[in-house]
Regions:
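Donor nucleotide-sugar binding/catalytic pocket of nucleotide-sugar-dependent glycosyltransferases
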Residues: 125-171
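Conserved donor-binding/catalytic core segment of Leloir-type glycosyltransferases
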Residues: 177-210
Length: 349
C-alpha cells in the first residue's frame, strides 16, 4: 500500500481551516486506499507561539523529527506548513533525496509581519526558498496561484477545498436567534488581528452582530464592542445550528488563502458579504446571487441581505472533499514521478 506522510505544525487542539482541510483529506484518502501517517506537534515537546498561545510550536531537534518521519516509512512526504516541523521535514527530504510536495495554506509573511517588525520581503524570500525546494506547491485558488507565481514560487498546482454537507445545511430559523433581533450578521473563525474583525464590528448595520470563535484578540474586542455577541468556539451540531441562524455571513479578512467558513455558510443557505480579495473572489466571483463582494464592506453586507439562500446552497454543492482529495492525490502522483509505483491515476477513477 502507498503511504503518504503528512507533516504539519497545525493540528489539534487548534481549530482552523488548515486542520480541517488536512483532516477531511485524510478521511477521503483512506477511502481511496492510501495509508496516511501524520507527523504533528503532538509527538514532540512544544511551546506556545509568542502572541498566539493557542498555537503550539514544536522545539524538537532535527534527529528527533527525522526519526519520526522514518518511523512512518513514507513512500512520499507532503509538508503542509512552513513552521518548525515543516522546516525539519524539508531538510530531511532534501538530505534523503525524497521527492516531496508542499501546500500554501496561510499568508505566513503577512501574519508574522502583523505581529513582529520583520519586512514582508524577507518573509516572502523564505516562502520562495521553502516551497521551491519541493516538486509541487499546492494552492487553493486561481488568484492565489497567480499571486505566488508573480512572487517567484514555482511548480504550483491547484488543491481546492470541500464541505461536509451532512453537517452544514439549511435549518429552521428561530425568531430571535441568540435572543437578538434580526437581521443577524455573523462571522466565524479565529479572533485574531489578521482576521480584520474591526472592519466588520465598526459597521453601522441593522439588527445584530455575532462573532463565533476565540483567539488572542477576543478580550480586547469584547470590551471595545459591548453590543456584539461573542459566543466563543462552537463545533459540530452547535456550530452548524449557529450558521443556519445567520441572515448574512460576513468575511472581513483580507489575508486568507481560501475561506472554509465561506463554504460552511453557503452550505447552510446563508449569503456571504466580503471584500473582493483572494478567497472570496474565487468562491463568489461570478455568483452574485449567492453573495456580495465590495470594497465597501457595509455595502456588501446590505446587498447580501437581498441575495438568495437557495443560490448560496447551490454554489456550495460544487465543492466536495472527495473532489478536493482526488485533486490532492493527483498532485502527489505528479510530484512523485516514478517513485510511487503502487499509486496510479487508476485509483482516481
Amino acid at each position: 500500500m502507498t503511504r503518504i506522510t503528512i507533516v504539519t505544525d497545525a493540528w489539534h487542539p487548534q481549530v482552523n481551516g488548515v486542520v480541517r482541510s488536512i483532516e477531511n483529506t485524510n478521511t477521503e484518502l483512506a477511502r481511496l486506499g492510501v495509508d496516511v501517517r501524520m507527523v504533528t506537534p503532538q509527538s514532540f515537546y512544544s511551546i506556545p507561539c509568542p502572541t498566539y498561545p493557542e498555537i503550539r510550536l514544536s522545539v524538537a531537534g532535527y534527529r528527533r523529527v527525522a526519526a519520526e518521519i522514518e518511523k512512518s516509512q513514507p513512500s512520499f512526504v507532503h509538508i503542509a506548513t512552513e513552521g518548525p516541523l515543516g522546516f525539519m521535514a524539508r531538510r530531511w527530504c532534501v538530505k534523503n533525496r525524497m521527492r516531496f510536495s508542499t501546500s500554501y495554506h496561510t499568508r505566513f509573511p503577512e501574519y508574522v509581519a502583523a505581529r513582529f517588525p520583520v519586512p514582508e520581503s524577507w518573509l516572502y524570500a523564505f516562502v520562495r526558498w521553502f516551497h521551491n525546494g519541493g516538486n509541487t506547491c499546492m494552492v487553493a485558488t486561481p488568484s492565489l496561484e497567480t499571486e505566488l507565481e508573480a512572487r517567484g514560487v514555482r511548480n504550483l498546482k491547484r488543491w481546492s477545498r470541500g464541505i461536509d454537507a451532512e453537517l452544514f445545511h439549511p435549518r429552521p430559523k428561530a425568531k430571535l436567534p441568540f435572543e437578538l433581533p434580526r437581521p443577524i450578521f455573523m462571522t466565524v473563525g479565529r479572533v485574531a488581528v489578521e482576521k480584520n474583525l474591526p472592519e466588520f464590528l465598526d459597521l453601522d448595520l441593522p439588527g445584530s452582530k455575532v462573532v463565533i470563535g476565540d483567539g488572542p484578540a477576543r478580550h480586547e474586542l469584547q470590551e471595545k464592542y459591548p453590543d456584539v455577541r461573542f459566543t466563543g468556539v462552537k463545533t459540530g451540531e452547535d456550530l452548524a445550528d449557529a450558521y443556519a441562524q445567520a441572515d448574512v455571513f460576513v468575511f472581513p479578512s483580507k489575508t486568507d488563502t481560501f475561506g472554509n467558513t465561506i463554504l460552511e455558510a453557503l452550505a447552510s443557505g446563508v449569503p456571504v458579504a466580503a471584500f473582493p480579495v483572494t478567497g472570496p473572489i474565487d468562491i463568489l466571483g461570478g455568483n452574485p446571487a449567492a453573495g456580495a463582494l465590495d470594497d465597501n464592506l457595509r455595502d456588501a453586507c446590505l446587498a447580501a441581505l437581498h441575495c438568495s439562500p437557495q443560490a448560496a446552497l447551490t454554489l456550495s454543492r460544487s465543492y466536495s472533499w472527495e473532489k478536493a482529495s482526488r485533486q490532492f492525490l493527483d498532485n502527489v502522483i505528479h510530484a512523485a514521478g516514478k517513485s510511487l509505483p503502487l499509486l496510479s491515476r487508476s485509483q482516481l477513477a
